[in-house]
A protein has these predicted regions:
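A generic secondary-structure micro-motif detector
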Residues: 26-27, 54
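Short beta-strands and strand-loop turn motifs
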Residues: 19-22, 48
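Active-site core segments that coordinate phosphate-bearing ligands/cofactors
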Residues: 2-18, 27-38, 42-45, 60, ...
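A conserved helix-loop-beta module that forms one wall/lid of the active-site cleft
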Residues: 45-56
């Protein structure tokens, strides 16, 4: 049972491994002990020998084999490190490599996270924890499903006229929509958008949640949404 990057490592090196950060997203890792949870494996009926060995993200876990070198053009013997999960790599990419630093990602989805010396176990289960690329740190996280995806949905479903206009002007539709949104006063005239197009995760996990606009009125203009 391998994550995507771990399968790539296997093809390059022949080693069946993963790192703590990616493993922490499987819900099978005891993140405080940095080992697979015997209790959870037993609960789900998963044999331990089906799971990869665990290493820190920066650990060299193998070298590129002769076969992989022939198939990829890479140099045989090149060291390969365990790497990290996407969220934990984004954390380091944002410069969050010390306790107390925070960051926000706005992509297709979005999340807010921080580097912490210990995991934050929320009794209401609104958030979750990754292991940081630095195995001495954690990244408690709250995440939403449709951030940039909401913007794309609005462009595709509600902005046919703007798409044509942007094409005529030779600019990206998002650039035109940005100019339009800048004309709306702060607060968008009281219009509120709930971005639950794909259900929602934090703070109340609900796959059946659906999005809506709240506060529509006769004074609402296209620039507001």
């Amino acid at each position: 049972m391998l994550n995507a990057k771990d399968y790539m490592i296997y093809r390059l090196t022949g080693e069946i491994v993963t790192d703590y950060s990616d493993a922490s997203g499987t819900n099978l890792l005891d993140i405080t002990q940095k080992k697979w949870s015997d209790e959870l494996l037993e609960c789900f009926g998963i044999e331990r020998n089906l799971l990869p060995e665990l290493y820190p993200s920066s650990k060299i876990v193998g070298i590129i084999t002769e076969e992989a070198a022939r198939e990829t053009g890479l140099t045989a013997g090149t060291p390969v490190v365990a790497g990290g999960g996407d969220g934990s790599c984004a954390c380091v990419g944002a410069g969050v490599a010390a306790e107390g630093k925070t960051y926000c990602v706005l992509g297709s989805s979005s999340w807010i996270s921080a580097a912490a010396a210990k995991p934050f176990f929320d009794e209401a289960r609104r958030t979750f924890n990754w292991v940081h690329l630095d195995p001495e740190l954690y990244t408690p996280c709250g995440t939403m499903q449709a951030a940039g995806l909401s913007y794309k949905w609005i462009r595709d479903v509600m902005c046919g006229e703007e798409r044509k206009e942007a094409k005529f002007m030779g600019i990206d539709t998002y650039e035109l929509l940005g100019h339009l949104a800048a004309l709306s006063p702060p607060g968008a005239g009281g219009l509120l958008y709930l971005p639950y197009l794909l259900g929602e995760r934090s703070p109340r996990w609900n796959s059946d949640a659906r999005g809506c606009f709240v506060g529509l009125g006769m004074s609402t203009e296209k620039k507001d949404r």
